[in-house]
From Swiss-Prot:
It comes from Pseudomonas fluorescens. Belongs to the CcmD/CycX/HelD family. It is a single-pass membrane protein. Its main location: membrane. This is Heme exporter protein D. Keywords: Cell inner membrane, Cell membrane, Cytochrome c-type biogenesis, Membrane, Transmembrane, Transmembrane helix, Transport. It is found in: Cell inner membrane. Required for the export of heme to the periplasm for the biogenesis of c-type cytochromes. The chain crosses the membrane at residues 19-39. Pfam families: CcmD. GO terms for biological process: cytochrome c biosynthetic process; cytochrome complex assembly; heme transport. InterPro entries: Haem_export_protD_CcmD, Heme_exporter_D. GO terms for cellular component: plasma membrane.
């Protein structure tokens, strides 16, 4: 599929809104799938560090 201009590429024969929204949602899901475990691990390590400090203070 070829387009006459970049504007035509973005419009995608009047399906651009659907196509680019689908790409954006897909990208958001991929980013969340990468970020969620990283943030969960960070939160877990912080909680464990707090727990360890509490136990050693007693």
């Amino acid at each position: 599929m070829s387009f006459a201009s970049f504007s035509d590429f973005l419009a995608m024969a009047h399906h651009g809104l659907y196509v680019w929204t689908a790409y954006a949602i897909c990208l958001a899901v991929l980013v969340l799938n990468v970020a969620a475990p990283i943030l969960a691990r960070k939160r877990y390590l912080q909680q464990e560090a707090r727990r360890l400090r509490r136990e050693t203070e007693k």
